[in-house]
Each structure stands twice: as structure tokens, then as C-alpha cells.
UniProtKB/Swiss-Prot annotation:
GO terms for cellular component: carbamoyl-phosphate synthase complex; cytoplasm. One of its GO terms (molecular function) is carbamoyl-phosphate synthase (glutamine-hydrolyzing) activity. Mg(2+) 4 binds at residues 859, 861. One of its GO terms (biological process) is pyrimidine nucleotide biosynthetic process. The gene is CPA2. Disulfide bonds: none annotated. ATP 2 binds at residues 729, 768, 770, 775, 800-803, 843, 859. It comes from Eremothecium gossypii (strain ATCC 10895 / CBS 109.51 / FGSC 9923 / NRRL Y-1056). Binds 4 Mg(2+) or Mn(2+) ions per subunit. Mg(2+) 1 binds at residues 303, 317. Mg(2+) 2 binds at residues 317, 319. This is Carbamoyl phosphate synthase arginine-specific large chain. Pfam families: CPSase_L_D2 (PF02786), CPSase_L_D3 (PF02787).
Amino acid sequence: MSTAGISDEASASAFTTAGYCPQLIKGIDSVLIIGSGGLSIGQAGEFDYSGSQAIKALKETGKRTILINPNIATNQTSYSLADEVYFLPVTPEFITHVIKRERPDGILLTFGGQTGLNCGVALQRAGTLEKYGVTVLGTPISVLETTEDRELFARALKEINMPIAESVACSTVEDAVAAANDIGYPVIVRSAYALGGLGSGFADDDLQLRQLCAQSLALSPQVLVEKSLKGWKEIEYEVVRDRVGNCITVCNMENFDPLGIHTGDSIVLAPSQTLSDEEFHMLRTAAIEIIRHLGVVGECNVQYALQPDGLAFKVIEVNARLSRSSALASKATGYPLAYTAAKIALGYTLPELPNPVTKSTVANFEPSLDYIVAKVPRWDLSKFQHVDKTIGSAMKSVGEVMAIGRNFEEAFQKAFRQVDPSLLGFQGSDEFADLDEALQFPTDRRWLAVGEALMNRGYSVERVHELTKIDRFFLHKCMNIVRMQKQLETLGSINRLDEVLLRKAKKLGFCDKQIARAISDDLSELDIRALRKSFGILPFVKRIDTMAAEVPAVTNYLYVTYNAVKDDVTFGDNGIMVLGSGVYRIGSSVEFDWCAVNTVQALRKEGHKTIMINYNPETVSTDFDEVDRLYFEELSFERVMDIYEAECASGCVISMGGQQPQNIASQLYEQGANILGTSPEDIDKAEDRHKFSTILDTLGLDQPRWSELKSLSEVKHFLDDVGYPVLVRPSYVLSGAAMSTVYNSEDLEGVFESAVAVSPEHPVVISKFIEGAQELDIDAVAYKGSLLVHAISEHVENAGVHSGDATLVLPPQSLKEEEKTRLKQLAAQVAAAWNITGPFNMQIIKTAEGGHTCLKIIECNIRASRSFPFVSKVLGVNFVEIAVKAFLGGDLVPPSCDLMARSYNYVATKCPQFSFTRLPGADPFLGVEMASVGEVAAFGSNALESYWVALQGLMSFCVPLPPSGILLGGDLSKEHLGRVAALLAPHGFTLLALSEATCEYLSRYLPAESSVTVLQMPETGREVRALFEQHNVQCVVNLAARRASSPIDPDYRIRRSAIDFAVPLFNEPQTTMLFARALSAYLPAELEMRQSDGPETPSYVLPWREYLGFKPT
């Protein structure tokens, strides 16, 4: 364990010295923390974790904390953390308004990702921080600018003779081409001030470079053209430095994939596995030298390219802020990086800070690991049409998992099961028509291609290495798994599986189901489980303590392994187990982490010991100090049951982690686990589409006409009766996976096959799709079938857009009192019919039939939904806390309360955040399968105001200003496009169309003095970009009636071009109308504010507390 870099001055003042008083930065009583905004690809839940840690650290030191973050789903915007929360856009303008109102003494910029950092730089350049006397805490802005500006960065590293890739900073396409010709192809292009490699990529010639730079420079003011080092090893070091120069390296990590794939899309191992001692210390020394020379104060990430067969290395980049890698390093080592960085920002030095894990060592001890951590990314590219599935220097993954084991094989296999529960471990797939190509040109299925080559196609380690450039060490480790798999396959019968072989397989990370499947199709995982237990083969529980057990630890940060001889902990507390959400993916994100964290907090408040199981390094729920016992483990039946039995748990909460815990509820229940809340038998009656619809019919509750889909011939009989369009829905899926709206017979067969494939063990239901219906969400909590509390949110979009992609308004603005009463009755009837105890969510459509309003139930999930944080925070009532009291029962159960009967003088709107910019080729068209990756929300005095503020919190939006161009197109058979144009025309925008037919259509809606300029449809991407630039297009409205069937579809090309060139896109009629109304209402004030030197703070810039009228507790 190393204490290198500690000065004499600092080490004399260790935190244990009696009477010692740290020399903190003076005059800092209140601190503004900049959040990262809505989750997106490249900037996800890791900033909720780091921001929450920072707030804890500041409050512990007695500082008043003010947070600005529109992401209402986060833990950091919870009741119990910051003193003041502003649900406002993270932009320089809104941050300025908050600074004027709150007058903070200090500001933290490095806990809000790239968004927060960019805002800080903009505020400094505008003179705002100096004007209001706000001190930047931690790393100075000049240092942040140096690390973000590629030219300044290169110059700084050359000052200390640190090797970097030869590079040239460019601000035009022609400059980039000239630079590449000087450097020599292949080159990599990197964008300045960009997140997750956005706008970066490789180019082998001038044509590729021009196409890449055209897009990159639309997203960033500067690009760096540098010599490609594709194929070198990629190594990362997490470094911490305090104000007096003490430095430690907290963790070093090695990418399984060679350089060329963004680290966020790479499999990562910690600690590094293939470095020699010389290489390790060479890079460690360089990292410390870099961070000292730059002057970073706090946490920093240094990325290297290392020559595979020599000691040459190049510095790729430095992130002088908390990042995705720092969250991983923090969870991998147990060292609280964000907490420590926040303390350092206040002026503490490393020797003055205790290690909160051991409580007996100081923070300047470098962590030591006696285990291996594997991080594997999760992609959801299959949800998108026409998307480019190759992976490279621009990040595309939506989440990641972290697995812990005592050897590579154990951690590696765990990680793959965590990424996708349908997988058994390291395995192949027969999907690759050209396996060599799949290995050489990586996609999101890369590791399956490696598994197929080694496990099923007989490729040698050398051949796979030549095609992939993956280090031979890793491939030989994979071969250990392959050999065990082959050995198991030869057995043929469980009777031939002896104790020695079974134990060896478990030590290599094989799960029970994987072993059963290898031996015989007739075996189940329960067969292997019974045999394993009869042999006494049980996993051991080990502790992560940052010190490799050299120093006793007081926390319970745990993992499970078969590579041990004893447990590190004792059992018998009979705690309540809470299952987390697992990997972030489209449909399951930070919302469920909020639910899980609030569950354990509510349980602890009632005096119960808590056990959390989760494996997501980006989450607050996997923070060591949130629960009594944290297991960084799989959410599989096998692992959950192992822990449940070892801990002698008194109960298990499966309804707060989204769909994944729900999917194993029945297995846990059948094996004797005490499931708190609704019985899994009743849950199954809601998850199974056939059972659900049958019960609704029995109760006489209205729903769209439906039938169980068993064969295409039966479907056609149903269609003869109800007609198109219809909705096809599988059971037990999340975020509308494989759900489709079918408009014609040509699409039906493919949709049918996809739905059956995604949920083969459960029925698929087909129902009549009712066009033009309004969709409503009900979030509720019940106790033994009686409704306790509910909230009704309105969708802005009509039914047909997944609820996770919908814009929600709460309280509802267009519902009549009798409709709200009927909705409450429906919720109460469902709660009673399914005997619900705990959370549930319903989706209902409102439609007119025969002159009457009809409310039809379309779905019910007996678990917390992704809108639980939204309704809890908007209404000021914690739905999760009420659900926990329902779980516990007795006198704790609160009386029923009708929140929808109350009067509210504010409205909140939640908007989805998409990451189409990150997904080249993906059609940004909304449908019944979810596509958004995050959300933002805002409060206002009315729905229009709250929507206008929320909209500005989206990364993809900037306010279009007249006389800029707005390009209009799409479905001309309905009036939506014309009504939008009529609202926009009076404000001086230049209205553009790409056909005479569109122009003629629009003329019917526009006043005589308005005109539409008709442009010719561009044929190439370069021509589209030229058109956008020439006509200053700042907004695209494309209301196509259907998703594009082909990439040559004109509407698709325009939608995709808007995304590629960072132009706001509106493509859903109701949302577009709301946008047009909001722009008409607030544009005059926006223009006036932009022209004013000291604009007045808008009335909607208020803290959450003032909207509610009380401070939530």
C-alpha cells in the first residue's frame, strides 16, 4: 500500500491529531452544485451517484447546499439531500438566475459531467462568477479549459515531455483534411467539449474524413485530428490530488478491447491484468506527473494508449472531473472518490480525511484489491430501425454492469449474465454469417462473436487475436471457460457430475442453469442446485474493504465467490432484502434506483436491517453507506436465493427494481422466499397478458378488443372482425420490447415472430389499436386490495407512443371531475381484484364512442413504475415510503388519501430525453417500443410554462430564433402540420418546405402575408448540411404518419439529418402543437431577455420547496 506524494507539511496533520483544525477555504457557507441533467448515452446515472456523494460530504461539513438539476428521477433531487433544489435546465442562463437568487459562496462544476463543466466554462467567460463573487471549488476553470481544449492540452503535456498522439486542432473541414494529409492516414477525429466521444471517429481517406468532420463540427466548435493508434492497449488511471500536491492513484483499469473502441463501450478489467510491474509504475508515475502539472484539485481520469509489445505509450486524454470511469473505480475499490473530491474542493488535504470504509486509515492510502472486477457495457441498438450497430470511438451503450470475482473467469461470466439475464455466461451465437468480419469489425455483439469463434467454430487463440487484437492473455482465460463447457457437455447425465468437477465449474463462474444446459436439455437449474447443496458446495461471502483485508473494515460491502474457504461476515440479522434494478437500459434507469434507495431508507427508518442486491456501478443503491449490507451481485434466482438463505432474510422486496426482479418473483416464492407485498401468483395474473385481459373481462372493466395470438390463421380471423390497426404485445417484457402496431397484412408475420421470440414461455396478445385516443397513467399504492394513494398523469402524445417516451403533465389539466372519479374507481377495482399490497401502475386510454367518453384499461404493472419519482416529487408525497408501510402492515399503514381531489397552484411537466445523436442511422420516430434514455422535468404556473422550461432542459433543444428557418413536412392528410405552421408564422420565422404539395397544403392554413419557401430535396448528406446552413434551419417539424420502411424515405432522411446536425426535431403532432403554443407565448420574453444586459429573473425560477408550499422531509 503506497502513500507516495505526501508532503511533510500535510502529513503532520492527520485527522486523528487531537485539536487539529483543517485549513479550509474561507468564506464558503453555501455551495451551488451543478447536476448533469437528463440521462443520455455517455452521461448516465454515475453523476447521480457522484452528485449525491458530494452533497453528503458538503452537508457533513455544515455547508448549505443548493442543487440545480432538471432530472426529477434522481436520488440527488430527493427530499433528504440538498437544502434547496431547482428543477431547472442546466444551462448558463438558468444557472445565472439561480446564482442571482441564492447568492452562493461557492460552486462545484465537476460533479455534473460534461454538461456541468461546459456551463462552468461559459459562466467564467461571461464574467458571471466574478460578478456575483462565486468561488469555483476544486479544479480551477483554467485547468478544465486546458483539459477540454485539445490544442491547449497538447501544449501543456509537451511542457513536461509527456508523449501524446501527433495531432492538429481544426475548426473547419478543409483544415481537417489538410491536417490529415500532413499526419498521414488513418486518423482519429476527436471533438472538443464533447461527451462520450460524441462526434469522434476514424477515417482512412479524405472522403470519410469530410463526412465525419461535417457532423463533428455541427456538434462542437473544434476537432482534433490525430494519428490513429487503433490496436494499442487502452489503460486508465484514476488519480486524486489535493490543494497541497498530495497525489494517489486509486485504481488502474485495462480495456479488454484494444484502442479504437470507446472505453464506455469496452469491457474493462480492474485492476489491470496484462501490465508488467514496469509498465504499471511507468503509467502511474506519468499520471501523477500530469495531474500535478495541470493543477487538478480533486479527482481526475487519465487515459493511455500503450504499445502491446513495448514500453511506448501515448496520453489519450484527461478528464478533470468525476466521470463514468471514476464511478466504476469507486465501486471497484470501495474508495469513495466523489465524497473525497468534494471534501478536497473545500480545502481538506488527503491525510486530513478518514477512509470512511475502514474508519481507521486515512484517505491517502492507495486501495489494494484481492479480487478482479469486470465491467461489461449494455447496448439496446436492436430497439432502433436502420441503426449502425458498429462500435468505435463514439459511445453507444446505455448502461454497464460490474461483476466481482476471485479470478477472471468468475467475474467475466457473472458480468455477461448481469448484462442480459437470458444469457448463461460466456457463450457464442450462430447469428454471424461472416464470423471473421464480425470479429474484425466490432459491433454490439462482439463478445458473442468471440465466444462463437472459441466455443463453437474451433478458432485458435492466435486467429482470434489476429482478427480482434484482443490480448492473448484474455483469450486464454476465455479458453478455460470453453474447456470446462466442453467437459460438461461430454457427461450426458447428472449422475456423472461429481463433486470435484462441479466445484471446479462453480469456481470458473458457471451458474447452475449453465451447467444443467451443458449436460442435458432435460435438466433444470433446480436439479443442479439440489446436487450442489448435497455436496455442500455453497458460495462464500467476501468483503470489499479497500485494503485487501490488511485492515479491519466496519462496512458491509460484499460479494459472493466460490474461490474462498470462509465467509468474511456472520449472519443472523434477519434483514429485509431489496432487489435493485440491475443494468441501466432503455426502460429501466435511474427512476428505479430512486425507488430502491427510498425503499431501504424507509425500512431503516422503521428499524429494519436492510440487504441490497444490485450490480450497477452507476447507482446510489450500490453506495456502501446506503444499506446495512450491500451485495454487489447478480439478480438471478440462483444468486438471490443463495443470499436469502445465507442471510436468513425475513422478507424480500421485488417490486421496486423494475421488470428484472419481477421476472424471478415466482421462482423465489416457490422456493419459500417471503415476498413482501403483492403475491407473485397475483403478479403473474397481471404480467401474463392473457390472464390479465381475461380477468378484466370477468370484472366487466372496459378494454380494447383482444385475443391471444397462437397462430397467424387465428390472428387473421380476429382481424376480419376488428380490422387494422392492431397492437401486438408479448408478456413479461420491459419498455415495450417487441411490441408493435400493425397497420397491414404485410407487416403482420414479422411482428408475430418477433413477439413470440422475445417471450417464448408466455402468451402474446393482440388487441385493437384505437387511433387518436388520449393516454393516462395512474401510479398508486394499495394495502390488501384497498387503494391508499394515487396520481393521474396525462400524456401529451396520443396513445401509440410508449409511456416512457411520453410527455407527462401532473396534475391533469384536461380531465373533468367525473373522469377523475371514474379513474380512481378503476384503480380501486384493479387493486381489489389483484389483491395488491404495495405499488402499481396502470395505463388507460380515453376515447369517444357513440358520443360518450370511454376509459379503457390497456395495462397494469404491479410494481413501481418509472414515473414514481415524478409523481412523488410533484405532489410532495413519497409513494415509495407509503408502499413500504403497506409492506410492513399493521399500525404503520396510513389512511387513504385522495391527492387528485386537492387543489394545486402549479403544474409539472416531464419530457423524455433521447440520444439519437449517438446512434447513427437510427430513425428518430416514436412508437410503442420505448426509445428514450432519460427525462427532465420542470414546474410552472401552468402546463405551457412548465413545458417551456422543461424543454430547455433537453440536451437536443435550443430555442429557435427568428428569422431562422423552420423546415416543415410530413403527413398532409391531417390538419396538425397546418395548425403548427399557423402558430409559428406570425413570429418572423422563415417557413421552408421540400415539395410544392407541402407548400400548397400550408397555404390553406397561413395568413395571406405569410409565405413558404420551397426547396429541392437534397440527394446527399452533404447537400442536406448545405441546405441547413444556407437557410439557417434551427428547427425541423416532420409529422410523418408512419415509421420509414427504408433509409431512402425522404421523411426519414430529413429527420435523421436534423439529428446529425444538432437541429431540434419535432415529429409527433400533439407535442409539436404544444411546442408551437409555448414558443408563441414565450418567444417575445426570450428575445427581450437575450437583448438585455441584466435580464430579470423569470417568475418560474423558484426552488421546489416554494412550488410545493412546504419543505418535503
